[in-house]
Amino acid sequence: MTLLRLNPTLFCHWRMLLLRPCVVLILWLMVAVWPLSAQAARPLNTDDANVVDPKGCQLETWVRRTRSSTEQWAVPGCNFWGDVEWSLGGQQRSEDTPWTSGLVLGQAKKRWLRLGDGDWGVATTLGFINTQPTSDFNATQRDVYFNAPITRALGQDRFVHLNLGWVQHNRDGSSRPSWGLGGEWPISPRLTAISEVYAETTTPSQYQVGLRLWVKPQRVQIDTTYGNVMGSATDQQWISIGLRLLTPAFLP
């Protein structure tokens, strides 16, 4: 991950990174498909009630580009035992200024009710986010959060996800409820459309729409999204591309 301020050469590099997955997406729409079981994951910010398969791991990585910054994310996670998914990852943010910042995220997600076809799933998540600015003008910030994802299966690989949570902000000592509502609708057995809206109370809601595609069923997935703040013009919009890798069970 680069720590440097974006220059025209780097911007062209990111533009190509954003265009290539779109080309891949179109190509894969032309190939044969077969039935798959869907589950919520990247690129949704609204979490689902599922966890990684027992003794398995995943890596979610993505790039998020706004008008003034580029974020690079990588979040690995594993299910060692007890239907608990442990994740520890980070983000690096490059502004169109001399400043950059880093972020460390860790969480544990427990599945309490396994999702079945035409059924409900319930989980809880407890985690933290540490922001590490490189600027001397900003101190390290730590947020702690709790979230309760609830998933409703509607059949035919259609899902609705509801999140209810709480966030404690270290910077100003404030605590706020958080919420999210998202959905998944299959376009084909490999391709799924997603949409969501989410926020912390007293802050503007954000929305996101996108596509998720299985390149290799249950092992390799790519995605792309567009998002914005409700009621905002184009100055706060973003686009993202992502890659998700899943392993078979291999942990002892």
Which positions does each model-derived feature cover?
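Transmembrane beta-barrel domains of Gram-negative outer membranes and organellar outer membranes
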Residues: Q39-P252
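Residue-level detector of bioactive/disordered segments in secreted/extracellular proteins
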Residues: H13-W14, V24, F80
